[in-house]
């Protein structure tokens, strides 16, 4: 069952808004054979020009679904967010099922969270390095193809994971030419 944590910035979340979000985003449950118990984090922000920004993050077992949308109409933005999330689920489910068929295993679509790393470095006038954001997360075992899929779903340029084949920490990244690279760590 998907539980919702809905927060509003410069906007009071009314029952009508809450119900609309829960009804629309809650329809994603139909894509799961076993509906996971997860919290969907929804943030709705309004701006001075009356436009709204909706962000939805749903951390599942093997993938994190995330989408954001800016729109002048809050309800239209929620509809667009739902469409984006549905495309992500279908894309992920198709790849997982295709891979499972190749491995002669058939498992229902799995589900769970993984938060990507976000560490930013800023150089000030004295050339001192200041870390302005730090995150911690557990590395999930997966292969490089799953890591690339996770990176694409999150919209990031790199993704750190525990490589199932080598049992080491690896990084996949998007190259400037649009292809992907893999960095594997070795123990000395």
UniProtKB/Swiss-Prot annotation:
Gene3D superfamilies: Ribosome hibernation promotion factor-like, Sigma 54 modulation/S30EA ribosomal protein, C-terminal domain. SUPFAM superfamilies: Ribosome binding protein Y (YfiA homologue). InterPro entries: HPF/YfiA_ribosome-assoc, HPF_long/plastid, RHF-like, RHF/RaiA, Ribosom_S30AE_C, Ribosom_S30AE_C_sf. GO terms for molecular function: ribosomal small subunit binding. One of its GO terms (cellular component) is cytosolic small ribosomal subunit. GO terms for biological process: negative regulation of translational elongation. Keywords: Cytoplasm, Translation regulation. It comes from the Bacteria. Residues 93-125 are annotated as: Disordered. It is found in: Cytoplasm. NCBIfam families: yfiA. Interacts with 100S ribosomes. HAMAP family: HPF. Belongs to the HPF/YfiA ribosome-associated protein family. Long HPF subfamily. Required for dimerization of active 70S ribosomes into 100S ribosomes in stationary phase; 100S ribosomes are translationally inactive and sometimes present during exponential growth. This is Ribosome hibernation promotion factor.
């Amino acid at each position: 069952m998907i539980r919702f944590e809905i927060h509003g910035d410069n906007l009071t979340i009314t029952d009508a808004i809450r119900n609309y979000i829960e009804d629309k985003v809650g329809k994603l449950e139909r894509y799961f054979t076993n509906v996971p118990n997860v919290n969907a984090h929804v943030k709705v922000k309004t701006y001075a020009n009356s436009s709204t920004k909706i962000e939805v993050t749903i951390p599942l077992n093997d993938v994190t679904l995330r989408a954001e949308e800016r729109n002048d109409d809050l309800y239209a933005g929620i509809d667009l967010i739902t469409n984006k999330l549905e495309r992500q689920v279908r894309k992920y489910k198709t790849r997982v099922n295709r891979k499972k068929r190749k491995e002669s295993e058939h498992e229902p679509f799995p589900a769970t969270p993984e938060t990507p790393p976000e560490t930013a470095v800023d150089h000030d006038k004295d050339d001192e390095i200041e870390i302005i954001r730090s995150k911690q997360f557990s590395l999930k075992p997966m292969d490089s193809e799953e890591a690339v899929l996770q990176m694409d779903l999150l919209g990031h340029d790199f993704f750190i994971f525990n490589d199932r084949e080598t049992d080491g920490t690896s990084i996949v990244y998007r190259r400037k030419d649009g292809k992907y690279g893999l960095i594997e760590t070795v123990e000395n």
